[in-house]
Amino acid sequence: VRNFVTCRINRGFCVPIRCPGHRRQIGTCLGPQIKCCR
C-alpha cells in the first residue's frame, strides 16, 4: 500500500503519526511519514 486510494480500498486510514491502539501499519499514504493503518 503506497497511496491514499489503495489504503482506503484495503479498509485502512492515513495518519501522520504511528498507528493508534491495536491498529497495525499496512503501508504508507504520502511517503514514509504518513502511515496507512488498519
Swiss-Prot record:
A GO biological process held by the record: defense response to bacterium
Keywords on this record? Antibiotic, Antimicrobial, Defensin, Disulfide bond, Secreted
Would the keyword Ribosomal protein turn up in this protein's UniProt record?
Answer: no
SUPFAM superfamilies from the UniProt entry: Defensin-like
Predominant subcellular localization, coarse grouping:
secreted
Give me the Gene Ontology terms describing cellular component: extracellular space
The entry lists its GO molecular-function terms as: CCR6 chemokine receptor binding; chemoattractant activity
- Return the SMART domains for the record: DEFSN
Disulphide bond pairs: C7-C36, C14-C29, C19-C37
Which tissues carry this protein?
Neutrophilic granules.
Q: Where is it localised?
A: Secreted
What is its biological role? Has bactericidal activity. Active against E.coli ML35 and S.aureus 502A.
Q: Which family does it belong to?
A: Belongs to the beta-defensin family.
Protein name in UniProt = Beta-defensin 8
Q: Could you tell me which species this protein originates from?
A: Bos taurus (Bovine)
Please name the taxonomic classification of the source: Eukaryota, Metazoa, Chordata, Craniata, Vertebrata
